């Protein structure tokens, strides 16, 4: 009637993992009916309620009429392109900007190989991956905010 993952606690490899703090501490929680009958419908109904609520409370409004002869002073991309837009805008050489953007996925690909010696699944026990994530997040937010400012304040955000 239910699908339960029961560990074999007589397995010495599993016991050694659990003794080191690796693995899960919640073995035996059934996926049926806990997740499929209770959690998923709540998430689906909550998402549906948010969509309906936003459609009723804040309907989309018409913007300014398009004028092909009047362009804005500075054209900004969508918000999710702000960090890369600011990086291309701030770096003096465009090839350097493209190489800097290509270095991001290349750096992310190297993280699992650097931390290959660490077998823990806990992010607090993976200091390199956590440091790369936190540094990248701060960099993206910093450059995203800087994209909305003039180019002379784009890196410093006007602080220095």
Swiss-Prot record:
Q: Membrane spanning segments where?
A: 36-56, 95-115, 131-151
Query: What subcellular compartments does it reside in?
Result: Plastid, Chloroplast thylakoid membrane
Which terms are listed as keywords in the entry?
A: Chloroplast, Electron transport, Membrane, Photosynthesis, Plastid, Thylakoid, Transmembrane, Transmembrane helix, Transport
List the Pfam families hit by this protein, alphabetically. Answer: Cytochrom_B_C
Task: Please provide, alphabetically and separated by semicolons, the GO molecular function terms listed in this UniProt record.
Answer: electron transporter, transferring electrons within cytochrome b6/f complex of photosystem II activity; electron transporter, transferring electrons within the cyclic electron transport pathway of photosynthesis activity; oxidoreductase activity
List the GO cellular component terms.
Answer: chloroplast thylakoid membrane
Question: One GO biological process from the UniProt record?
Answer: photosynthetic electron transport chain
Q: How is this protein situated with respect to the membrane? A: Multi-pass membrane protein
PROSITE patterns attached to this UniProt entry: CYTB_CTER
Checking NCBIfam families in the record gives: cytb6_f_IV
The family note in this entry says: Belongs to the cytochrome b family. PetD subfamily.
> Could you tell me what this protein does?
Component of the cytochrome b6-f complex, which mediates electron transfer between photosystem II (PSII) and photosystem I (PSI), cyclic electron flow around PSI, and state transitions.
Quaternary structure (record): The 4 large subunits of the cytochrome b6-f complex are cytochrome b6, subunit IV (17 kDa polypeptide, petD), cytochrome f and the Rieske protein, while the 4 small subunits are petG, petL, petM and petN. The complex functions as a dimer.
What protein am I looking at?
Cytochrome b6-f complex subunit 4
Q: What is the lineage of its organism?
A: Eukaryota, Sar, Stramenopiles, Ochrophyta, Bacillariophyta
């Amino acid at each position: 009637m239910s699908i339960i993952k029961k560990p074999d606690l007589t397995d010495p490899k599993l016991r050694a993992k659990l003794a080191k703090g690796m693995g899960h501490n919640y073995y035996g929680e059934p996926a049926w009916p806990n997740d499929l009958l209770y959690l998923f419908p709540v998430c689906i109904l909550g998402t549906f309620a948010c969509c309906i609520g936003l459609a009723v409370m804040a309907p989309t409004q018409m913007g300014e009429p398009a004028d092909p002869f009047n362009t804005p002073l500075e054209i900004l991309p969508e918000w999710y392109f702000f960090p890369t837009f600011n990086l291309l805008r701030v770096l003096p050489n465009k090839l350097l900007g493209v190489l800097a953007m290509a270095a991001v996925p290349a750096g992310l690909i190297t993280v699992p190989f650097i931390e290959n010696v660490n077998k823990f699944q806990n992010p607090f026990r993976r200091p390199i991956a956590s440091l790369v994530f936190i540094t990248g997040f701060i960099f993206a937010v910093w450059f995203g905010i800087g994209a909305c400012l003039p180019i002379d304040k784009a890196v410093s955000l006007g602080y220095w």
